[in-house]
């Protein structure tokens, strides 16, 4: 809380005129509300405990702090003693915080004094000096030494000696900057919030607000937030990478399956063209050799000369399967031999094997899907077996093909 807010009025000015009429300073209600809320003094002014005695969390912290400051085992301070003295002497939280400031000064300036005094005497004398400093003579909160001695169970002479030794150890320097009071208040609030949160197992919103105001907690929370952000970024990168990898794997697998299922592109269907080009080599009977050659040439004339010149080198020669040997039969007269005036025994070009087929063979148009070449008979005459076409007819076929399809 800003200190200037406590010393200024609503208009931002503080005047000494009529100061006696003010019961409290401007901003005192805010400070009282802060102490009640953060130091567990309660909210109800009528039923709950007032600010004239210490709350239970503040009493616990006071006992712990004074036991560490004065480690003497004689008259070791207990919480019951703190509660009794604070209730009988009406110790306010401001007086308690001022007493903590004095004890902190003694730890740095005169630590030998703390080694010889008991923690109970240190608590009693520090609270008495702080109350006398805050509440001057004539105030309602004024408490005399005999009343302090009765509250603490100490004789007045002993209490006076303790007061003189305490003031000597302090070198009579009791003035305190209000900023030191607010520093002690902030430290006390954080200790109370942390202690109560650990005791309950959970923290209230007020405790969290108090802890987040501390620089140590702010650094710890900032470091935690940075680590969480880094972890979130790493998890996000890992998630995106895994998703991208999964998508890429699915795409690759889909593409590979598509390529394997699709037929591979090949050369165009040349079966019909190759069949028409190589049809002259189909075996035929000797008497009909030239007739088959002429019919094949008439079927191939319909194709363009360009396609014939391009597809002829690409078409592999067909090799018909070998047939079983036929029994030798007497030779018949070959029309080709009669045309060239040759005798059948002397015609070696047509009758190389000296045998002809006597069994009927399958008609060509049934295998090729063509119409029968003979108009007078639906069934073709029997063909010769493979390798029965004469060399002369093959040569004339090549000559006719070169004339029809040049190049």
UniProtKB/Swiss-Prot annotation:
The chain crosses the membrane at residues 233-253. GO terms for molecular function: protein kinase binding. Signal peptide: none annotated. InterPro entries: Cyclin_PHO80-like. The keyword Transmembrane applies. One of its GO terms (cellular component) is membrane. Keywords: Membrane, Transmembrane, Transmembrane helix. It is a single-pass membrane protein. It is found in: Membrane. PANTHER family: PROTEIN CNPPD1, PTHR15615. Belongs to the CNPPD1 family. This is Protein CNPPD1.
